[in-house]
Amino acid sequence: MAGHSKWANIQHRKGRQDEKRGRIWTRIMREITVAARAGGGDLSANPRLRLALDKARAANMPAERIKYNIDKATGNAEGQSYEEIRYEGYGIGGAAIIVDTMTDNRLRTVAEVRHAFSKHGANMGTEGSVVFQFKHCGQLVYAPGSSEDQVMEVALQAGAEDVIMGEDGAIEVLTLPADFEAVKNALQAAGLRPELAEVTMRAENTIELQGEDAARMQKLLDALEDLDDTQAVYHNATL
């Protein structure tokens, strides 16, 4: 199927991650802690922890740091307790935004998220105000030039829901969250390594922003991403 390309947004996001690796590691360590406490340290029985470790390895986090966080989360040692909170809001041009956070102080976090929205001419919404515009799914994105036929054949045989060709040649594979690992592993076994692989909130429809509106939206997204308690930011804007 044809679809809008996410390539420019992915490249921008990867560039920011490279610039702020320390912050990315902090977010991943929080995810490891929450996943290990909720489901234990046995990787075979804890898919959320497996996904967190995949993120850690992709971010080049040292193995000893990963092990330390799992041991700390599953042992008797006292550590920080994190609460997962989702915020929703409206960006430039009415674009829908979801901000997923992990925090040890919800009052601090909601104040920081609200301030970021208002500072950039946007508004926080109520729970459920925009989340219906997104689909919880697995997503793998392959660079332009990848073989669409090969990706499609392997992905669909492994249980993918859809394979979408972007306007610039990038290929997007979508899965149910429960099927994400199996599809990713099948594609990797076939020698197909994605530029992006994650369980995400994918916008069902997009809003195109241009010029000054696009620049303002990007500043808002960057501000939300830069908050210490932010784990992920999802939106439906094409910039």
Swiss-Prot record:
The keyword Cytoplasm applies. InterPro entries: Integrase-like_N, TACO1_YebC-like_2nd/3rd_dom, TACO1_YebC_N, Transcrip_reg_TACO1-like, Transcrip_reg_TACO1-like_dom3, YebC-like. PANTHER family: TRANSCRIPTIONAL REGULATORY PROTEIN YEBC-RELATED, TRANSLATIONAL ACTIVATOR OF CYTOCHROME C OXIDASE 1. The keyword Kinase does not apply. Its main location: cytoplasm. Residues 1-22 are annotated as: Disordered. GO terms for molecular function: DNA binding. GO terms for cellular component: cytosol. It is found in: Cytoplasm. This is Probable transcriptional regulatory protein Veis_4238. It comes from Verminephrobacter eiseniae (strain EF01-2). It comes from the Bacteria. Gene3D superfamilies: 1.10.10.200, 3.30.70.980. Belongs to the TACO1 family. GO terms for biological process: regulation of DNA-templated transcription. Keywords: Cytoplasm, DNA-binding, Transcription, Transcription regulation. NCBIfam families: PRK00110.1, PRK12378.1, YebC/PmpR family DNA-binding transcriptional regulator.
